[in-house]
Design a protein with these regions (language model features):
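Positively charged n-region of N-terminal signal peptides that target proteins for export
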Residues: 1-4
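Bacterial N-terminal signal peptides
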Residues: 6-15
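Rhodanese-like catalytic fold shared by cysteine-dependent sulfurtransferases
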Residues: 19-43, 57-112, 122-185
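Short hydrophobic beta-strand that contains or immediately precedes a catalytic carboxylate
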Residues: 46-51, 69
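Catalytic nucleophile-elbow at a beta strand-turn-alpha helix junction centered on a G-D-S/GDSL motif
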Residues: 50, 121-122
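Glycine-rich nucleotide phosphate-binding loop and flanking beta-alpha elements
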Residues: 54
Length: 185
């Protein structure tokens, strides 16, 4: 019964066009639906972790992704004093790297592409939107990303414990897969 329900849910998720999805997540997909899609049709999908590899090193990784292609890379020479952090800049090779990853898998720009960042909002959604604007019509992003949203109040305020891939019981590890992680030239 669980398999039938999962198959029906996955089938429904694949048939609903993005235009009919929830306005807040017009082309978002849940972590669970992403996992199920990768299990059922992973050879037809390119699942990309768009975080900077250094972030992955400290936060965790799921080997369910096909590849790490950062959308933004932290520039360790550009300090943002106002926000007390290094400034991230768009990866100038992002589109070319996605094209190469698709080609390596025998896919084209019409394939489903799913991006995932830490929370879904800062890089996941923008990277999927950027891909759509650059000819990848079926790009989506994992809503709430890898770690999810922060808890706003109480003892665990500030912790990312309420949603996202990591908090959904899906496979992840503290170790990275070196075969999938982006390396700078």
């Amino acid at each position: 019964m669980k398999r039938l329900l999962a198959a029906c849910t996955l089938g429904l998720a694949l048939t609903i066009p993005a235009a009919h999805a929830d306005d807040a997540h017009e082309f978002g997909i849940s972590p669970q639906a992403t996992y199920e899609l990768m299990q059922e049709r992973g050879d037809e999908v390119l699942f990309i972790d768009v975080r900077d590899p250094v972030e992955i090193m400290f936060v965790g990784f799921t080997d369910e992704v096909d590849l790490n292609i950062p959308f933004l890379l932290v520039d360790r020479h550009d300090w943002d004093a106002e926000n007390n952090r290094f400034r991230p800049g768009r990866n100038p090779e992002f589109v070319a790297q996605v094209d190469a990853a698709l080609e390596a898998r025998g896919l084209d720009r019409d394939a489903r592409i799913i991006t995932m960042c830490r929370s879904g909002s800062e890089r996941g959604e923008p990277s999927a939107r950027f891909l759509r604007e650059n000819g990848f019509a079926n790009a989506r992003y994992v809503v709430n990303g890898f770690q999810g949203d922060t808890i706003r109040e109480g003892e665990y305020a500030g912790f990312r414990l309420k949603n996202g891939w990591q908090n959904s019981g899906l496979p992840w590890d503290t170790r990275m897969n070196p075969e999938k992680i982006h390396r700078s030239d």
